[in-house]
């Protein structure tokens, strides 16, 4: 009986504890990211932001959570009730399970699988289904139009994202995210320089993937009232809200892993190695999240034709050209990784 416990049950308990250890801090980070967003945008607009609930407004996310929890969940009469309830759950769950393959520090990763890049691409592609289901199940023209916009936007920018990731795979020679980070430790500086434009393209693409300004057309308030979640209230709205911000943190972690060295120090200086890798990872992700908030506070929304033109006529040809360029340079300089 004891052997059965240690062989089958104990590993499941360890996995459950690891999942809880990632999920709870992540939900707290999402809650306080909303607070940080309101404070940062307030400062940029020369106002205070939330500062009443608790010292410096630090209890504002808890007040918002309690408010949403006790609101009445309203389901439209003609809505598909089962899908209407499932849609926000799908969005929120998919935003969490992508973290399984993200390396927080050396050896600190929930599932260190050899196809981590394919896993993360699959999860990011599936995340749009929650929005599409919400738009269709709501039986509202505004919600449905927001869902259609979201699917078109995802298709347009997922292609460019995939090609950008191919350039990273060409230089590192692996689909394992931990190995991608370690490969950047010894990567020549000129390869890093060559990947910089693709890092910018990737970051702009994930802005579109997460429906953030200037690409928030699926929930454009001035056109679609609130877009795909116009009919949601209470915890349904809260789960969409949490899913959006959890996706922001996830794509920032992906950008950090692919282009900023993950948990590695920013410079190859010996004394920087004394600082734990987790600190560098959090610092880089925090910087990218600040860029998300900065962009929201300063840039206007794109028109829909501008959004499509940027994805298909600018990013797609540019990333295709860069894949050929990186391949040619690596072959010419004999720097193709030994796979």
Swiss-Prot record:
GO terms for molecular function: NADH dehydrogenase activity; oxidoreductase activity, acting on NAD(P)H, quinone or similar compound as acceptor; quinone binding. One of its GO terms (biological process) is aerobic respiration. The chain crosses the membrane at residues 9-29, 50-70, 82-102, 115-135, 161-181, 187-207, 235-255, 275-295, 311-331. It comes from the Bacteria. It is a multi-pass membrane protein. InterPro entries: NADH_UbQ_OxRdtase_su1/FPO, NADH_UbQ_OxRdtase_su1_CS. Its EC number is 7.1.1.-. Belongs to the complex I subunit 1 family. NCBIfam families: PRK06076.1-2, PRK06076.1-6. NDH-1 is composed of 14 different subunits. Subunits NuoA, H, J, K, L, M, N constitute the membrane sector of the complex. This is NADH-quinone oxidoreductase subunit H. It comes from Rickettsia bellii (strain RML369-C).
């Amino acid at each position: 009986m004891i052997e059965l416990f240690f062989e089958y049950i104990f590993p499941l308990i360890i996995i459950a504890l690891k999942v809880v250890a990632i999920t709870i801090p992540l939900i707290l980070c999402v809650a306080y990211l909303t607070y940080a967003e309101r404070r940062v945008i307030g400062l940029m607009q020369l106002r205070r932001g939330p500062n009443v609930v608790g010292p410096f407004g630090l209890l504002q996310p808890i007040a918002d959570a309690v408010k949403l929890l006790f609101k009445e969940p309203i389901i439209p009469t003609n809505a598909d009730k089962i899908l209407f309830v499932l849609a926000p759950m799908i969005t929120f769950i998919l935003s969490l399970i992508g973290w399984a393959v993200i390396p927080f520090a050396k050896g600190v990763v929930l599932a260190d699988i050899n196809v981590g890049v394919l896993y993360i691409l699959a999860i990011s592609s599936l995340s749009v289904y929650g929005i599409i289901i919400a738009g269709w199940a709501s039986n509202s023209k505004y919600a449905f139009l927001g869902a259609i916009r979201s699917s078109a936007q995802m298709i347009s920018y997922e292609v460019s994202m995939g090609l950008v990731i191919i350039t990273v795979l060409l230089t590192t020679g692996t689909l394992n995210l931990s190995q991608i980070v370690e490969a950047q430790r010894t990567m020549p500086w000129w390869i890093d320089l060559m990947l910089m434009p693709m890092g910018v393209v990737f970051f702009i693409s994930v802005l579109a993937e997460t429906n953030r300004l200037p690409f928030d057309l699926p929930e454009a308030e001035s056109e679609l009232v609130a877009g795909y979640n116009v009919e949601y209230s209470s915890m349904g709205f809260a789960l969409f809200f949490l899913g959006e911000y959890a996706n922001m943190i996830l794509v920032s972690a992906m950008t950090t892993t692919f282009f900023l060295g993950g948990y590695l120090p920013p410079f190859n200086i010996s004394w920087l190695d004394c600082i734990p890798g987790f600190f560098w990872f959090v610092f880089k992700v925090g910087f990218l999240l600040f860029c998300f908030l900065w962009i929201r506070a300063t840039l206007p929304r794109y028109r829909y034709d501008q959004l499509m033109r940027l994805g298909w006529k600018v990013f797609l040809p540019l990333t295709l050209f860069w894949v050929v360029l990186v391949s040619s340079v690596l072959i010419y300089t004999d720097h193709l990784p030994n796979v």
